[in-house]
Amino acid sequence: MGNKISPTSFRLKITDTWKSKWFSKLNFADMLQEDVRIREYLEAHLKKAGLSRIDIERLNDGTITVIIKTSKPGLIIGKGGAGIEELKKRILSKLGIKKEIKVTIEEVRDINMHAQIIANQIAEQLEKRMAFRRLMKQTLEQVMQAGAKGVKVAMGGRLNGAEIARTEHTSAGKIPLHTMRADIDFARATAFTTYGTIGVKVWIYKGDIFEDKK
């Protein structure tokens, strides 16, 4: 069962928490749709900013707080915070959201321990026609050297321009998908190549959440 569903949702409230933190009895569908649109917009327009995670919180007065975790905060903040103000204006105008929005930037330091950053980097290199096997090998080495206890990378599509699509995967260390206390960071990304799209999945095992108590 553990290897058939998202490792993140499988361990919610154990090793991770929800990316959207709010509650609504009446306008749940509309708010959820707004969250999806905000995330899609930010992921599309901040590709080079090293995005790791986007959390969205809402207050009772309707204020939306967007927390962006990134390895390159300077690219988003801009000079004197001008980048954040411009980003807020674009979200309000392009998505048609008529609510107050606050944007908070949090820096991610150890980029090789964040699955989303790694997945995005792989997708970017695939779009530049880098050999997928070389990418896999480099990724395993980088993540394991950063202190991970295990890493797995899977790619699916017309790899290296092959006529028939296939899925390739490789791993190092261990990935205990059935252990609920295992802190596993999971992420997906899509590479848009001249041969079609290539799906990328990354699992990073950081250890058990109870290890410090043993």
Language model: regions and residue ranges:
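RNA-contacting regions in translation and RNA-metabolism proteins
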Residues: 1-214
